[in-house]
Each structure stands twice: as C-alpha cells, then as structure tokens.
Amino acid sequence: MKIALLHFSFEDYTIELANALANYVDLTLIQPHKVAETCQDALDPRIQVCSFKKPRIRDPRNIFSMVEMMQIIRSVRPDVLHVQETNDFWYDLTLLFNTMPPLVTTIHDVFRHPGDQQTPPGAEFTRRISFYRSQQLIVHARSLQETLVKQFRVPPRRVNVIPHGELGSLYQRRASGTPPEREPHTLLFFGRIWAYKGLRYLLEAMPLITAQIPNAKLIIAGRGEELNQYFPNGHDEKHIELLNNFIPVNEVAGLFQRSAISVLPYIESSQSGVAALAYGLGTPVIASNLGGLREIVHHQQDGILVPPRDVQALADAIVKLLDDQVLQHQMRTSTLERCQNDLNWQKIAIQTLELYQKAILASKSTLGHWG
C-alpha cells in the first residue's frame, strides 16, 4: 500500500507515526521546508520525503504553495492521503476545490483552545471542510468523537478513536548526556503557557504543598503568556524554577526524568501530547478530570485526576504522591507499561492501517478514481 502523510506541524507526533508506518507501507512524507528541518534526522531512512515552500499564513503566495503541494500529491499517486490537522485555511480551501485521493485526517483539536494566539483567523471555520471531505477521521479521545458526531453531525462510522502515542522514546533519542537523577519532590509544568493550561491554579496550590513538604519545587518550562502577571513581586526561587523560553529538544527528556510528577491543571483539554511525553519518560501525571485527560490518565494507576480549578484538591493529590515513594514507583512502572500497550506506536500504526482500508473502500463507493 502506498501512503502519503501530509503535515504542516505536529512534528513529534508525525515522526513517530511515520516511523511506525514505514514497517508496513510504502510511505512518502510531504511537508513544508521549514518543518522538514525539524524532522530530517529523526525519520526512518525507508521514508521518502518531499518538501514544498510554505510562506506565512497571510502571504498570497500560498496559492502557489498549494499548487506545488498538489503536484507532489499527484506525482506520488498514493492509495491514501493521511493529513495531520493543518490549521491552515489555504489547505482547507485547496481540499474544497480539488479532487483528492482517499482521505484520512487526524483531528488533534476540534476547537481552538482558550488563549490560543497561533491558530490563524478563519481556520476555525474552514477546518470543517476536512471533517466532511475525509473518508475517515482520527481523534485521540472519545470526547472529541462525541463532539464531531453530535455538534458537526459527522457519521459515527467515519470517526475513530486511536490513542496519542507516547513521545518519550523520541526525546530520549534526542537527549544529550546522562539522564539525571529523579528528584522525589520536584513537579513539572511543561509546554505552552496559555490560559487553558491552568497554571494559576497550580501556583495557588504551591503554598499549600510547601506547607506540608517544605522542599517541594515546581519547574515551569515553556513559553507563551507573560509570566510577570503571575509573579508581580518576583518568584520564590527556593520553590519555583522558571524556564520561560523555548526548551531545546535535547533538554526536554531531562526535565521529565528529573521530576517526580508532571502536573496538568488544565481548565480545558482535547487530548495531551504532554501526558504522552511524560508517560514515555516514566513520569506520573496529575491532571484535571476533563476532556481527553480523563481518558489518557488512568486514575490511581499511572496518575491522579482532580476536579478542574480546585486548588485544594490539586494540592492534596500532589502532596499524597510526593509523600509516598512506593506509590510513585508503582505509577512510574504503570506509565512505562502503557507505552508497551495502548500508547505503543506499532499498535497505533496497525490500527491506522485498518482505517486506510476503510477509506479506500468508502472512496470507491462514493468518489471513484481520483487524479
């Protein structure tokens, strides 16, 4: 089977999926030049790579970019085109006005997150084109499946739940130096710092935590919102370590390996690449009990779920886990077991192959030959 995998972003996810799929199909990865630089050293050599120029989103030269992209797709002549959600209205309009091969689209987020400043204007509406033009859709949580079926009236037979695979293995390969020692009282808040991530609730919980565990420390690693709003009078350097910038890829694994817990106090969630990364590095997760988080975190097995916006419950859960080394060890073991089961990329690739077959059959019955 010949597959074309197209992505504009979600590089980590795409790398791991592509490497797993390469064991089963003839795979061509299609991507913008600027994304290719991120992926080039991490891809299986069996994967053919095609790149195209992609200007900034408001640049009208995107018309020519989409023409080049379509020329690549037609030259590959794939049995299936699998697209990672693009958040790009130029692609969406190209999809609307062109005949495509059997199409599978992975939808990572049905709606834009609160505080999202990166999704281009208009993409919130044009992205719906892919909901209806795709023969099969992939989401990473049942809650997203339900949204597509109930709010967007996508037929249930076309919406499939496949877990978000673990990302720890990728970052272990990228890491430099010896893995650090696990710090039994260190917490990690990692990733984009946007309103929906709920950092304010974790910061409000910190005094409650340190009152019971004086040597507890929180690492805040990532960029996004201006952190001065959280620390108008400066931060407590004894208990908070700020890394308010882009974290180099060779340093990411070390942050999770240092930390006893990855904390995700989100107030809204579709799915979570951060949880998938934490589990791949053997770090338990304490997260809000909502959205896709309640599906990826197995409560009391590999993490703890707490009510969103509940500072006391969040503090209690963190203290409980920080104070129990045996429980930490049990949960670390469980996270790594998950990476050999539902979060394993080979298993995810096999599930994805089944959807490719479904997409081909659906396309034959409705669209006929393309190209």
Mark where each language-model region is.
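Conserved acidic donor-binding segment of nucleotide-sugar-dependent glycosyltransferases
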Residues: 299-300, 304-311, 320-326
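Nucleotide-activated donor-binding/catalytic signature segment of Leloir-type glycosyltransferases, i.e.
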Residues: 229-253
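Acidic anion/phosphate-binding donor-loop and adjacent secondary structure
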Residues: 116, 149-150, 157-158, 163-183, ...
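Acidic donor-binding loop of glycosyltransferase active sites
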Residues: 254-270, 283
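Short hydrophobic beta-strand element within catalytic cores of glycosyltransferases
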Residues: 284-287, 297
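Short His-centered aromatic/hydrophobic patch
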Residues: 10, 65, 83-90, 107
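Membrane-proximal helix-turn-helix segments that form the acceptor-binding/catalytic region
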Residues: 67, 71, 120-137
